[in-house]
Amino acid sequence: MTAQLIDGKAIAANVREQVSRQVQARRQEGKRAPGLAVVLVGEDPASEVYVRNKHRACDKAGVHSVQHKLPADTTQADLEALIDSLNADCSIDGILVQLPLPDHLDARPILERIRPDKDVDGFHPYNLGRLAQRLPVLRPCTPKGIMTLLQESGIHARGLDAVIVGASNIVGRPMALELMLAGSTTTVCHRFTRDLESHVRRADLLVVAVGRPGLVKGEWVKEGAVVIDVGINRQDDGKLAGDVEFAPAAARASYITPVPGGVGPMTVASLLENTLFAAELHDGMHA
């Protein structure tokens, strides 16, 4: 069996186009464009690239985006004051704080200070709690994007044995909630998991998000499994690699995401969807 590639770039482009059409429809109804504020602290090169990509995607979709670039020595109090002002700004529907923050700043109270209805990253305890209650509002972007990849590829998660490798707050844990909501029997593997291979071998649907190139051996992949590789790791030769050994996994899987061009584009597309959804929430609040 040779796996069919799940083209995240193409699916993300369709999502962005859909958002663009809905934004245009809003404007024709006399409503304002959705507004996204992106907060960047310090000068981390990778973060600057991510932020630039987000602004570019917003511009193409007609979403109004504003960047707040703060120096690396910004205090906790100053950052909290900025969040408070953005919470009160009626032109801003979504607030995104680009992680990681400099070491002297505590990200948790910053993320929790964002109003839940403006939390377009989906990291606020309120939004994670709603997802756990099976009543999602603003959903974490990467897991939401993965669910869109599955849906657009005609893959039904209901009844599948799903295994998630990685238990981060950003991907692994909310991914488990998404898959349970979709009807999968879900196992989460982490650094204390014994015999990772045995869990991977029984997975109908495998999601790997650890940040270790080649962690999951291709020979472990069950024949006909769906493989979603969230990892993106730069190797010594400068090439990008996922957390799964791609070629041997693709020889066994039915579907697989490439790295790059699989999950990554969906994260930004989901951010646009969340920002539009937040704007619609605010329409209802101010009606």
UniProtKB/Swiss-Prot annotation:
InterPro entries: Aminoacid_DH-like_N_sf, NAD(P)-bd_dom_sf, THF_DH/CycHdrlase, THF_DH/CycHdrlase_cat_dom, THF_DH/CycHdrlase_CS, THF_DH/CycHdrlase_NAD-bd_dom. Pfam families: THF_DHG_CYH (PF00763), THF_DHG_CYH_C (PF02882). Catalyzes the oxidation of 5,10-methylenetetrahydrofolate to 5,10-methenyltetrahydrofolate and then the hydrolysis of 5,10-methenyltetrahydrofolate to 10-formyltetrahydrofolate. Homodimer. Keywords: Amino-acid biosynthesis, Histidine biosynthesis, Hydrolase, Methionine biosynthesis, Multifunctional enzyme, NADP, One-carbon metabolism, Oxidoreductase, Purine biosynthesis. The keyword Disulfide bond does not apply. This is Bifunctional protein FolD. The keyword tRNA processing does not apply. One of its GO terms (biological process) is tetrahydrofolate interconversion. GO terms for molecular function: methenyltetrahydrofolate cyclohydrolase activity; methylenetetrahydrofolate dehydrogenase (NADP+) activity. Belongs to the tetrahydrofolate dehydrogenase/cyclohydrolase family. It comes from Chromohalobacter salexigens (strain ATCC BAA-138 / DSM 3043 / CIP 106854 / NCIMB 13768 / 1H11). Pathway: One-carbon metabolism; tetrahydrofolate interconversion.
